[in-house]
């Protein structure tokens, strides 16, 4: 019964155990894996320790014994020692020296945070996200445990950024870029970038997400890229630009250009945004999956019908 129950969600497990007195005791043996927001009622349950994924809207008296995912939305620097995923409020802009416990694996700062981080990020952190106003020195301050790193709108310390980012980082997001991409470390394989790109993107990049605003200048997309995503603001002609190494191609919600002869024959998975209203009847035969918005109402040829997925 315990093994079968692993295929059920939290609510289904509780309903199952409530069907008879014999099964009622299973509540103390079931592991509740689905994410829940902690309430006083949940905290008082005799099987509270069996909740494995919880969000804390307040600091409880204790944490579930078997919890593996504990998220906390912090408004102050008082962080419980058992939190694994830490999210700071957008209004938080206090010093953080000594406030992030070693249990934390992911840290996301709010939009106005702009404090020194020297010696503040523990070696347990693997994902580190800075908000829009952060623009501090980072050299030597990001631990080698970090594999995913995000910088916001205000960060402009790009010169020799390859000296600032540890080699452990493989996924990098730059919300505003205005420099030569040669500064991007070659250890990065997943790059998200928004702004003007100068120079040549490193051949280490296999996953590229690109977005721009008022102006757009084509740059060279290396043939190492297999997964290409255009952001929500991108709405430009891509004919003769996308390399034939790309297999997964995603356009953002505002993209609405003609695609005839614009999709390379290497593409197998194609996704269009919410406002796309052009014909898809001329996509290459290599395309196996086409994702379209539920509001898309352009006629689709019969031979493509089985490839369409609505979202």
Predicted feature locations:
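Short, T/G/N/S-enriched strand-turn elements that build extracellular solenoid repeat scaffolds
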Residues: 15, 26, 41-47, 57-65, ...
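Short helix-loop-helix/strand-helix junction enriched in hydrophobic and basic residues
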Residues: 2, 11-30, 47
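Extracellular beta-helix/beta-solenoid repeat scaffolds
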Residues: 103, 124, 145, 168, ...
């Amino acid at each position: 019964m315990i093994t079968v129950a692993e295929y059920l969600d939290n609510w289904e497990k509780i309903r199952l155990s409530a069907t008879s007195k014999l099964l009622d005791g299973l509540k103390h043996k079931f592991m509740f894996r689905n994410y829940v927001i902690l309430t006083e009622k949940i905290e008082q349950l005799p099987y509270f320790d069996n909740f494995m994924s919880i969000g804390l809207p307040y600091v409880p008296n204790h944490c579930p014994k078997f919890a593996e995912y504990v998220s906390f939305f912090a408004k102050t620097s008082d962080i419980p020692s058992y939190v694994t995923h830490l999210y700071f409020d957008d209004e938080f802009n206090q010093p953080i020296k000594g406030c992030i416990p070693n249990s934390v694996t992911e840290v996301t700062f709010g939009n106005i945070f702009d404090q020194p981080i020297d010696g503040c990020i523990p070696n347990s952190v693997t994902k580190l996200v800075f908000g829009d106003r952060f623009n501090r020195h980072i050299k030597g301050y990001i631990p080698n445990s970090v594999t995913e790193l995000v910088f916001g709108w205000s960060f402009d310390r790009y010169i020799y950024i390859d000296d600032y980012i540890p080699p452990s980082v493989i996924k990098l997001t730059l919300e505003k870029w205005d420099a030569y991409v040669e500064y991007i470390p070659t250890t990065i394989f997943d790059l998200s970038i928004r702004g003007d790109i100068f120079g040549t993107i490193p051949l280490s990049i296999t996953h590229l997400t690109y977005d721009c605003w008022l102006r757009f200048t084509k740059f060279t997309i290396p043939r190492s890229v297999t997964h290409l995503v255009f952001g929500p603001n991108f709405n430009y002609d891509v004919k003769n630009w996308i390399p034939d190494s790309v297999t997964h191609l995603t356009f953002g919600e505002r993209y609405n250009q003609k695609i005839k002869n614009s999709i390379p024959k290497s593409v197998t998975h194609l996704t269009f945004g919410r406002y796309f209203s052009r014909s898809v009847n001329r996509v290459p035969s290599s395309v196996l999956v086409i994702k379209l918005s539920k509001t898309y109402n352009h006629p689709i040829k019969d031979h493509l019908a089985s490839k369409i997925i609505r979202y």
